[in-house]
Amino acid sequence: MRTIKIGSRASQLALVQAEIIINMLKEKFPQYTYEIIKITTLGDRILDKTLDKIGGKGLFVKEIQKALAEEKIDLAIHSMKDMPGETPEELVLGAITKREDPRDVLITRENKSLEELPKGAVIGSSSLRRQAQVMALRGDIKVVPIRGNVGTRLGKIETESLDGVILAAAGLNRLGLKEKISSYLEIEDFTPAVGQGALGCEARRKDIEMLEMLLAINHEETYRCVMAERAFLKLLEGGCHVPIGAYGQQQGQELHMTGMVASSDGRRVIKEQVMGDIADFQALGIQLGETLIEKGAKEILETVNTDNRIVNTEGS
């Protein structure tokens, strides 16, 4: 009997997510045994720098992908929002599970919404995408970088005297911490990260047995939407750690998709929408990316990347 070795980050949230996938597989394939292999990624090891300052793409996935390619594990579980646009040729995303709530949320001391926070409030965030959109909506708010797992970031409201922090709704829901949420940042105003709320299952291209198993747990609607978002991301050559977001939603036989690129300070925000036949999901993602490029998205992202390179040079 085959034991399926599943690679996961070691955080509480990552392990909960791995168990979600294992339970889905067990229901369909009870004849196998399943084992979680904990893997520490570069993003987990370096906690004294913001993600955009570490540089590179795939900070939370590369080591897991390496273990998969080297056949130390059979299956890699990722938060889709951590996945760079490019994946290694020998690996394939065999399944994307049904999306959890894709929204970002605000957790504040006094249960206030973003609009209700006082002038000059200090918010903690781990991403430039969130920082840029907060500053675009509330230029008077100060956004400070915070790192660590969900519990650590929640704790920083007290330990670092923050007025609040921004996290993903999906992670809090999966950890049973929904009651912590003060307010939801609605998608119309606050574009999520590419793939936010969805889990991805990656296997070796040559492992036909594993890929057939993954097909049984794939959520086709979420798969199409997220792959459209990833086509957008790939065209813009954006990593997970630049101010870029996209969200696709199937409505009937149509895909409705929003894409956003912003400067780090939120002073420039380009946001566009596209809709079309869901069967053309990849092409729609590319079309949306091309529209943003025509409006100056590449120049904005290059400025962000240049700023990060300067900071990295000064810090070395």
Curated annotation (Swiss-Prot):
Cofactors (names): dipyrromethane
Cofactor binding note of this UniProt entry: Binds 1 dipyrromethane group covalently.
GO molecular function: hydroxymethylbilane synthase activity
Gene Ontology biological process: protoporphyrinogen IX biosynthetic process
InterPro entries in alphabetical order: HemC, Porphobilin_deaminase_cofac_BS, Porphobilin_deaminase_N, Porphobilinogen_deaminase_C, Porphobilinogen_deaminase_C_sf
Any coiled-coil regions, as ranges: none
GO cellular component, one term: cytoplasm
Catalytic activity as recorded in UniProt: 4 porphobilinogen + H2O = hydroxymethylbilane + 4 NH4(+)
Keywords per UniProt: Porphyrin biosynthesis, Transferase
The protein's Enzyme Commission number: 2.5.1.61
Pathway it works in: Porphyrin-containing compound metabolism; protoporphyrin-IX biosynthesis; coproporphyrinogen-III from 5-aminolevulinate: step 2/4
Modified residues (S-(dipyrrolylmethanemethyl)cysteine): 240
NCBIfam families: hemC
Family: Belongs to the HMBS family.
Subunit structure: Monomer.
Function of the molecule: Tetrapolymerization of the monopyrrole PBG into the hydroxymethylbilane pre-uroporphyrinogen in several discrete steps.
Matches recorded under PANTHER family: PORPHOBILINOGEN DEAMINASE
Additional comment: The porphobilinogen subunits are added to the dipyrromethane group.
Protein's UniProt name: Porphobilinogen deaminase
Organism of provenance: Alkaliphilus metalliredigens (strain QYMF)
Gene field: hemC
